From Swiss-Prot:
Name of the molecule in the record: Glutamate--tRNA ligase
Predominant localisation class: cytoplasm
Keywords: Aminoacyl-tRNA synthetase, ATP-binding, Cytoplasm, Ligase, Nucleotide-binding, Protein biosynthesis
Provenance organism: Mycobacterium ulcerans (strain Agy99)
Motif mapping: 'HIGH' region: 12-22
Catalyzed chemical reaction(s): tRNA(Glu) + L-glutamate + ATP = L-glutamyl-tRNA(Glu) + AMP + diphosphate
Source organism, top-level taxon: Bacteria
Pfam families from the UniProt entry: Anticodon_2, tRNA-synt_1c
Binding site for ATP: K259
Compartment annotation: Cytoplasm
Transmembrane segments annotated in the record for this chain: none
Primary role: Catalyzes the attachment of glutamate to tRNA(Glu) in a two-step reaction: glutamate is first activated by ATP to form Glu-AMP and then transferred to the acceptor end of tRNA(Glu).
Family statement drawn from the similarity comment of this UniProt entry: Belongs to the class-I aminoacyl-tRNA synthetase family. Glutamate--tRNA ligase type 1 subfamily.
EC number of this enzyme: 6.1.1.17
Length: 489
């Protein structure tokens, strides 16, 4: 097999909100396809009408597009093996089931769960062992009798009487002993196909060569291999694909990250202001590393280096602090103009409007780019520029606007009132001359009261630049208002 013939797939069910573990799986499949020059197939497994929703389907499209994980075949781009939504492939599955039955690879099973348990108990076995392959040997007359009773059978695959083994690209040689996996259902009693059928069936028909998926699906692999072998017998499959079971993503306290964990929600990270580069970089580290000596890399660098054989089999813990730190580094790496555009779009989306023209907004964006972890942080630093969001924090006032601040504010007001031009350089020169030179104050004592008076907080973008953005009139107005609230020393 040549590298360019590699075909991988990402096949989520449209239920709920995209999960970061699911996105990690999509990323590894996408990166492997791009690294090998192969094909990334996006398929929707929407056979569960009770749980699937159009809203979740659209959320999946939104997630992949936001992350920049483009697909070569799938919804809205089509391809040679469509349709790519399983709900539109029902007739295909019915045809495959019919061929499996005709070839003797599958059979009708009429046993109820209660009957299976009763047989286990009668034989002295654990009643929870699962299906016992009883219906394999039914005669035509027995089947006819069950049908006459009105029973609706399921279709089960006839499992081989041999070990099922494969070389997992992440975990190495893996074997399930003969007889350890019972014959399993391919359809419901209604005739509707089950996931156990449609997933391998679509992989075969779409000529998938490598299945990269979560470790939680490993127990289903022997069933799928057996089905691939049966599909090869009836001319549906060309091969059994190679498998790679990716490590489990853990949350707090080494428990598997679940949909109930806040870190699992992809859109919660986006809403906080993660950028795709930062989130993808971090998710790539959940089971893979580009090198031992650094964790920061671009998506292009990942594509150049990624090999599924290098994925670690050990569970990976989602560390929010590390994810935040990596995102902060990627924000700093952005071109200033790119960052400015992304920040403007983020603030607009979240209803945060700054009373700044484009030029002033660009200045403000550059001031905060190296001071934030996620885009959300920028609003906390810049909202003082809006008069309707400006208020002096009581804790900041208690720290910086005590009686000793009165003379400092008086001197600052006088110095700024006399500044010839309202530029960062002129503001800095005027304040340093008056407060550090004239009053012999240390910078923290000199500028702390001014920062709190002008921005309402002890944490802000650089002071002199902030005053320039505020403008002369608003800056002096806030300083005078703060001075009026400060008592005499």
């Amino acid at each position: 097999m040549t590298s360019s013939s590699v075909r991988v797939r990402f096949c989520p069910s449209p239920t709920g909100i995209p999960h970061v573990g699911m996105v990690r799986t999509a990323l590894f499949n996408w990166a492997y396809a791009r690294h090998t020059g192969g094909t990334f197939v996006f398929r929707i497994e929407d056979t569960d009408a009770a749980r699937d929703s159009e809203e979740s389907y659209l959320a999946l499209l939104d997630a992949l597009r936001w992350l920049g994980l483009d697909w070569d075949e799938g919804p809205e781009v089509d391809g040679p093996y469509g349709p790519y939504r399983q709900s539109q492939r029902t007739e295909i599955y019915h045809d495959v089931v019919a061929k499996l039955l005709t070839a003797g690879e599958a059979y009708y099973a009429f046993s109820t769960p209660e009957e299976v348990e009763a047989r286990h108990i009668a034989a002295g076995r654990n009643p929870k062992l699962g299906y016992d392959n009883f219906d394999r040997q039914l005669t035509d007359s027995q089947r006819a009798a069950y049908l006459a009773e009105g029973r609706k059978p399921v279709v089960r695959l006839r499992m081989p009487d041999t070990d099922l083994a494969w070389h997992d690209l992440v975990r190495g040689p893996t074997t399930f002993a003969a007889g350890s996996v019972p014959d399993f259902a391919l359809t419901r009693a209604t005739g509707d196909p089950l996931y156990t059928l449609v997933n391998p069936c679509d992989d075969a028909l779409m000529k998938i060569t490598h299945v990269l998926r979560g470790e939680d699906l490993l127990p289903s692999t022997p069933r799928q291999i057996a089905l691939y072998q049966a599909l090869m017998c009836i001319g549906i499959a060309e091969r059994v694909p190679e498998f790679a079971h990716l490590p489990t993503v853990l949350g707090e306290e080494t428990k598997k990250l679940s949909k109930r964990d806040p870190q699992s929600n992809l859109f919660a990270h986006r809403d906080r202001g993660f950028i795709p580069e930062g989130l993808l970089n971090y998710l790539a580290l959940l089971g893979w590393a580009i090198a031992d000596d650094h964790d920061l890399f671009s998506l292009d660098e990942m594509v150049a280096a990624f090999d599924v054989a290098d994925v670690n089999s050990n569970p990976a813990r989602f560390d929010q602090k590390k994810a935040d730190a990596i995102n902060a580094e990627h924000i700093r790496m952005l071109d200033v103009a790119d960052f400015t555009a992304r920040l403007r779009a983020y603030l607009d989306t979240h209803g945060h409007q700054l009373a700044l023209d484009d030029a002033a907004f660009a200045v403000a964006a550059e001031l905060v780019q190296t001071r934030i972890v996620v885009l959300e942080d920028a609003w906390a630093l810049l909202k003082f520029l809006n008069d309707d969001r400006y208020a002096i924090d009581p804790k900041a006032a208690a720290k910086e606007l005590g009686p000793d601040a009165g003379p400092v504010l008086d001197a600052a007001i006088a110095a700024l009132d006399g500044a010839a031009d309202w530029t960062t350089a002129d503001i800095e020169a005027a304040l340093k001359t008056a407060l550090i030179g004239g009053m012999a104050l240390k910078p923290r004592k000199a500028f702390g009261p001014i920062r709190v008076a002008a921005t309402g907080t002890t944490v802000s973008p650089p002071l002199f630049e902030s005053l320039e953005l505020l403008g002369r009139e608003r800056s002096l107005g806030r300083l005078r208002s703060a001075r009026d609230q400060v008592g005499s020393p």
